[in-house]
Swiss-Prot record:
GO biological process: basic amino acid transport; transmembrane transport
Family membership: Belongs to the major facilitator superfamily.
Protein name according to UniProt: Vacuolar basic amino acid transporter 1
Protein's cellular compartments: Vacuole membrane
Lineage: Eukaryota, Fungi, Dikarya, Ascomycota, Saccharomycotina
Keywords, in A-Z order: Amino-acid transport, Glycoprotein, Membrane, Transmembrane, Transmembrane helix, Transport, Vacuole
Organism: Saccharomyces cerevisiae (strain ATCC 204508 / S288c) (Baker's yeast)
Membrane topology reported for the UniProt record: Multi-pass membrane protein
Cited function: Transporter required for vacuolar uptake of at least histidine and lysine.
Amino acid sequence: MQTLDETSNLLPPPEEAEAPPLEQKFHEYNLALPKFPILFSLWLGSFLSSLDSTIVANIMNRVAEEFSESSKKQWIATSFLLTNTAFQPLYGKLSDITGRKSALLTAQFFFGLGCLLTCFARNVTEFSIARAICGIGAGGLNAISSIAVSDICTARERGVYQGYANIVFGFGQLLGAPLGGVFIETIGWRALFGIQVPVIMLCSVLAIKNINIKLFHVPPMKERYTLKNLSRIDIFGSLSLVATISGVLFLCSSQLNKLYLALFTIGSFIVFILVERYYATEKILPFELLTRSFCLSSAVTVISSFVVFGEIFRSPIYLQLLQNISVTKTGLFLIFPSISVAVGSLVTGWVLRNTKINLAHCAYQIIFGGMIMQLLGLGLGYFLLSHLNPDYTIYDMLESITFRSNSIWWKLIYVFASVLVSFGYACLLVATLVSIVFTVEKSQQGTMTGVFYLWRSIGNVLGASLTLVSYENSLSSMLWNYMFKTKRDDEYHFTKKQYYSLINDSSYLRGPNFPTDIFVRILDVYKKAFLISYIPNIALAAVGIVLSLYLVKHTYKRSSSS
């Protein structure tokens, strides 16, 4: 018999406390719902979102060339990811106050509208604006899919179902790259975005029919769309966050006044903190719920997302420019990382479901392993590219092995390095989501899952943009130095028109515009610019390993003491 004193806790631990009767009733109802119709309704939209992301990664260089605005191609990727970042956490809160179905239909509307407008873009600016509208919806498609899975599954089941979800997501990424290549070289990229509109309309019909999840904390239908209820959505926090991230991107890529941009960025960040701390009633970033473990895992998530999206958007440009590989064949290179995302998600879900150790500690060990794989993949990729000359030359890795640009060996190593980065990312993603379900109250899971996707999206937009900006800035300065400042041993004289043609239209590089020896040296400048773009990613991956190791040790001590 247990002895009690005045310090004894008479209440059961939070995970053992009984839920209110109605909440428990709704929970049992949701668990009993037929899963396939719900998951199909959710995952079809998620599939489209993932398809869209790799389509753009593969075709953005060609689209920018078509508009003769290659120097702006980072905005094709960034505009979509920026709005995705800003609105994703709002969908978590929106689904908590209006229900999962209403939030999902809102996301589907913006995604379809963005795809439709993309078809009619006449320049990179219009293309980017349309992609931004599409990103508003895409953020919700992914976030609500993950949130709704937690409603109809137990915590341990969620790891497996999240693995299935990432298989669907990975399959979309797998098809996106080759489809983008085939379409842009046959019927054009406009049709590729146009055919997504009727598909997302079908998703809306399925959502209306199948998404019937009941939630205890959602107000009655007549109260959901009142001004008082909708005012709970933290729109000012979201807008100030967009302003902060946009300021960072403009600081890195714009020729505007750096002082004013820096002041704008700092001011926006201060406004965001003040709104989240003192103004917003229900925050997109609830500081009071941010435990040390969640903060560490969030930081690692940002880093991992930065690394993988930097790779996704750098890889096609490298293959197309330096190795002269077509858009269609570039898509084949991107298939393997997409497969690794699906496999990594499934394996992680299986491990978490069958582990005998503390579930949270197991999840954090997987996060640590995922970061190690990403650093190894980046290091291998950097080593390969630093020794592999563009397109035609010979590189002796070992005395018995010779690489040529048309050799299968460098391609296998390149794919393996990309697979390591993507596999590690998938493991980290599933493990972090499961740790949220295991450590957060049911009523806050939608919000905290939205916060998780906020961190992931911040990593996505910064990784894609800053990696491309690092490459573009390095290329601009190095080309200028080579063409006009460096003393060369040849007699060739460059013109500024040639310089700006290379910067604004990357197809100019492969045209008959330079003598062979000059062309070779220009390619070497491009190669050095690509290598420089690896450095921030490698440094961040190393930081991620340190943080995830601390996370493992922290949870191990906590689980041992308990």
